Regions:
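Cleavable N-terminal export/targeting peptides
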Residues: 1-24
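Short glycine/proline- and aromatic-enriched beta-strand/turn motifs that initiate or cap beta-hairpins
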Residues: 19-87
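Residues that define the transmembrane beta-barrel architecture of outer-membrane proteins
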Residues: 23, 61-65, 111-115, 130, ...
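Membrane-embedded beta-strand positions of outer-membrane beta-barrel proteins
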Residues: 25-29, 69, 81-83, 119, ...
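Transmembrane beta-strands of outer-membrane beta-barrel pores
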Residues: 29-35, 85-89, 123, 138-144, ...
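Outer-membrane beta-barrel "beta-signal"
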Residues: 31, 234-246
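Flexible, solvent-exposed loop segments that connect beta-strands
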Residues: 37-57, 89-110, 140-156, 188, ...
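Gram-negative (and chloroplast) outer-membrane scaffold detector with strong preference
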Residues: 70-149, 158-176, 203-205
Length: 246
């Protein structure tokens, strides 16, 4: 009986090792069709707009590029790494005092370049076709605001830490995967989140490098409520892209 139990344990460990990837690299690039909405009311003149007044989004769609890469390694103590980039474009109007100059419905452009640095751990690694990752996202946002009517331009960089959760399910006997990830932080009054859900299809005719297609929906929300700033801005829409798995 002892030999049988030992054999079963060894077989289970070997099966788990066979199902888990010791090392893996994945990357993707595509376009996100963004629909912005909301407004920003502030008396904080130290921000990117240096504004005592209100900015309101014109809610005009735009297509912006995104890129991501996932690096998984076999060292248990060290976290795996996921890196992401996306740009966000928002056009609207500003009313108030900007850098000491009074404006009314002044056309305003805000561009945000986002770099996400995500160390994470595999809690489940394709165990029963399910993957679960937990980690921390450091979202670096480089913002630039431009009001052409008063020849005003300003930029700012902030870092937002968020909890990162990703789950994935491989549909058996197909090359289809369903995946979602959430980046989230709140202090009760203010909340920031970045949520994605997608379906992808892997083309497995190449053994070493496997191309894939992904289609999904993404929503970012910035709901800030403090003494001098009330922000309610949202960016959402469908995205699609190409992937490579090594």
């Amino acid at each position: 009986m002892k030999k049988i139990l030992t054999s079963l344990v060894c077989m289970t460990m070997l099966a788990a090792t066979a199902n888990a990837d010791l090392a893996r690299v994945e990357m993707g690039v595509g376009s996100w069709q963004q629909t912005p909405s909301g407004s920003l009311e502030t008396s904080d003149t130290s921000g990117v707009l240096s504004l005592d007044g209100t900015y309101t989004s014109a809610e005009e769609d735009s297509s912006e590029m995104y890129f991501w890469v996932l690096i998984k390694h076999p060292i248990p103590v060290l976290p795996n790494v996921r890196l992401e980039y996306v740009s966000i474009a928002d056009e609207g109007t500003t009313t108030g005092i900007v850098n000491g100059i009074g404006v009314t419905d002044a056309e305003t452009t805000i561009d945000m370049k986002q770099f996400d640095i995500i160390p994470y751990y595999n809690i489940l690694d394709n165990t029963g076709w399910v993957t679960l990752d937990l980690g921390l996202d450091l979202k670096v946002i480089q913002s630039e605001a431009d009001i052409s009517s008063i020849h005003y331009s300003s930029d700012d960089t902030i870092v937002i830490p968020l909890i990162y959760v990703r789950t994935r399910v491989e549909i058996p006997a197909t090359n289809i995967g369903v995946e979602a990830d959430v980046k989230y932080i709140t202090d009760g009054d203010s909340t920031v989140y970045d949520i994605r859900a997608k379906v992808d299809y892997t083309l497995d005719f190449i053994p070493v490098i496997q191309p894939a297609l992904e289609v999904g929906y993404r929503i970012q929300k910035y709901d800030i409520d403090d003494s001098d700033t009330k922000m309610d801005l949202e960016y959402s829409g469908v995205y699609a892209g190409l992937m490579l798995r090594f």
